[in-house]
Design a protein with these regions (language model features):
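Transmembrane helical segments that form the transport core of multi-pass membrane transport proteins
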Residues: 1-70
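C-terminal transmembrane helix pair
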Residues: 54-140
Length: 140
């Protein structure tokens, strides 16, 4: 985790030369998910940024970022953002899964390594679908 955070800091330092950072890039890459969840305006970019932070770093850092923005969001948007961040699907958890399951079954480590990325993507979509259900329920 410390390595990922350090790598992100180095990349942000480099992108700072172009007046960019990874959070803004993630905000625009993952903004369509925020739009599909029924968020609007500034909330869409915030949701994209949070999803990107969750995927690249981890959910705790994304929740910390969300806590700084809760005053700006209405209750529905806050619930949608919080539910979309619940889950264990991020890059650091891929390594944990390979390491922990690989110890239990060392001869299948190559299969686990091949499938863990698909499992992470599935976990991201499950979190987004859970947030979509919250979005639908709280429309009324």
């Amino acid at each position: 985790l410390v390595g990922f955070i350090g790598a992100v800091a180095v990349i942000n330092r480099f992108l700072g030369l172009f007046n960019l950072n990874l959070e803004h890039i993630f905000g625009y890459l993952f903004a369509p998910f925020g739009f599909l969840l029924g968020l609007d305006g500034k909330e869409v970019l915030l949701e994209g940024t949070l999803l990107g932070n969750k995927l690249i770093l981890n959910e705790f850092i994304a929740f910390g970022e969300l806590s700084t923005h809760l005053g700006e969001l209405d209750a529905r948007a806050g619930m949608i953002c919080a539910i979309s961040l619940c889950g264990f699907a991020n890059l650091s958890s891929m390594g944990m899964c390979i390491g922990s399951i690989g110890v239990l079954c060392p001869e299948k480590r190559s299969v686990i390594s091949r499938l863990v990325f698909r499992a992470m993507i599935g976990g991201v979509f499950v979190s987004i679908l859970s947030a979509l259900l919250v979005s639908i329920v709280f429309l009324f």
